[in-house]
């Protein structure tokens, strides 16, 4: 009698574990669902095609992905100068050059390819106009967790591969 009871308990435990595992698997979030939200810039590295490192400036920024397929991206140098005129439309030539060369922002729509872990971007507006409508704008997700994400921009217009690290905004 005790053997039957032990067998029944073992089988019940096995089926319960199986059912819970399947329920957890079915409830797993899609990659797109994991991306939705705002992410704060942590760091980035760059490599040229020959494998040499590209010096990266100290940056701050954020990227936001919405559930309806829109995104917004901005990074800017932490050492950008303040405008002496204190007016956004009246920087000195040096101030304007520093800000223009030390900042990038763009926005548009995105689609996630779950199989290749790739974010395909359609850039509609950018501080670098050459990106608007440019083909094959993609980011490859290298890792994503509840509070941290990393992606690679496989080839910038300058021929550099960038790896970005982000933490989820709280």
Predicted segments — roles?
Residues 3-7:
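N-terminal export leaders
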Residues 11-170:
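Lipid interaction determinants
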